[in-house]
């Protein structure tokens, strides 16, 4: 089967600044991989490169065996951006059914996607009348309705209450158990423990790539917040460079 995503020496420059600096990593199939890091660390740029909509300076990104952005991937990759990507003048149901039709799916699949994100009670509402968190979930339903092999989710739980966050993560893991690969970004470190594997980015560099348990063990602490702080401090630029030094300590694949 191989890995769902293979990134090698990825470089991205934007506005005269290096946004991603030589990132190499893999994302295994059928698992939830978390992309963690502070705001502005390069998470969204990394996801855009995986989807194939980001101009890259160097390196390669392979997705499901194809170069990122290949036409063959259009119906295999679902992408949820931070900004709502649905039509405000249509209802939640109309949006979901429209995107379902684009993927050759029917009304039943659209209605199921709405239910899966907890919006069944708001299916008849215009998206423009929804709260920010509800709009995000409407976008999520549209990203999932095509049953893609790979789902890229950029901050999917921002603005959601704790109960709904838990429900969404349960849904993500159910999808992974059924064979879907998920790459989920967050700047909220308490969501890291919900992932099967973690990629930690800071200032455009990969400083950790391993399971939550292995990262805690490498840092010598039980708390992931503290583990990340220690890895960040240990990964300050030095002779070996931050990414290389930390990947060596955690034993992560890159």
Spans of model-derived segments:
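Conserved ABC transporter NBD signature motif
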Residues: 55-73
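Catalytic Walker B motif of ABC-type/P-loop ATPase nucleotide-binding domains
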Residues: 151-155
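ABC ATPase "signature
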Residues: 209-210
